[in-house]
Regions:
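Carbohydrate-interacting regions of secretory-pathway proteins
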Residues: 23-245
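C-terminal motif of bacterial Sec signal peptides marking the signal peptidase cleavage site
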Residues: 19-21
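Bacterial N-terminal signal peptides that target proteins for export
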Residues: 1-13
Length: 245
């Protein structure tokens, strides 16, 4: 992540998320070839409570502490693209307990992230929100540490090696948040699980740079965020959410 101061076919992607969705906290993500032309979701996904967060208008997003979508973000052919350094995007809605699924692709040396349960109390969303790290492990310096490699809960919980696909290939990710329990999945494999507020979590946060921000990770409800402040390109597709009731 290194903050500053301030294809696979659709069928393969769906099959990966079928495995990813089979968690202790959430139900499986249904797979199908019958895709809705308006939402980008399959009929089974829609029936199962999934909702797409992407459409050409980007009406479900805005800039962090802004009212509109900032320069640098665009949507075409089902793909959300960030070009160059841009302000972070946040969802207009807030979410508490949910499954968030998405496909992502980075160029060689690429670096980005997806935040969850973020607030706008600080200057940057990453001071309040845990981050699912997106990274080209092979070429970016952050890939030298599992704490900051692809799929990690950035700088707090490490991810295992050998799961992320090479640069310029699509990866499929799933984040499951239910109460204080969180899971990160990548390409059908569970990477990590942690409990917010546990003694282990408290110790890890205390040992991280986030100790400077008392409310880091503590919101029970917040925004989904897409990191834009690094140079380079980020591509996202099939971004969808299912709230856990």
């Amino acid at each position: 992540m290194m903050h500053g101061t301030a294809a696979r076919t659709a069928i393969i992607g769906q099959l990966a998320l079928v495995v990813a969705g089979c968690t202790q906290m959430g139900n499986s993500v249904p797979a199908s070839n019958s895709t809705s032309s308006t939402s980008g979701l399959t009929a089974e996904q829609t029936a199962g409570g999934w909702r797409s967060l992407l459409d050409p208008s980007l009406a479900q997003w805005r800039g962090y502490k802004q009212q509109t979508v900032p320069t640098g973000w665009s949507f075409a052919n089902g793909v959300l693209t960030k070009t160059g350094s841009a302000e972070d995007l946040v969802s207009k809605d807030q979410y508490g307990n949910f499954e968030l699924a998405f496909d992502w692709k980075l160029p060689p040396g690429g670096n980005a992230g997806v935040f969850y349960r973020g607030t706008e109390e600080y200057d940057h969303i990453y001071w309040s929100a845990p981050e699912y790290q997106l990274l080209d492990d092979a070429r970016h310096p952050d890939g030298k540490s599992r704490l900051t490699s692809a799929g990690a809960d950035y700088a707090v919980y490490p991810s295992p090696a050998g799961v992320v696909k090479p640069a310029d290939e699509w990866n499929s990710s799933l984040i499951v948040v239910n109460g204080n329990r969180v899971q990160h999945w990548l390409n059908g494999q569970k990477l990590l699980e942690y409990e917010i507020g546990s003694s282990d979590w408290e110790a890890k946060v205390k040992a991280s740079k986030f100790v400077a921000y008392p409310n880091y990770g503590r919101a029970s409800r917040g925004y989904i965020g897409l990191q834009g402040d690094h140079d380079g390109t980020l591509q996202l597709r099939n971004v969808r959410i299912r709230e856990i009731k």
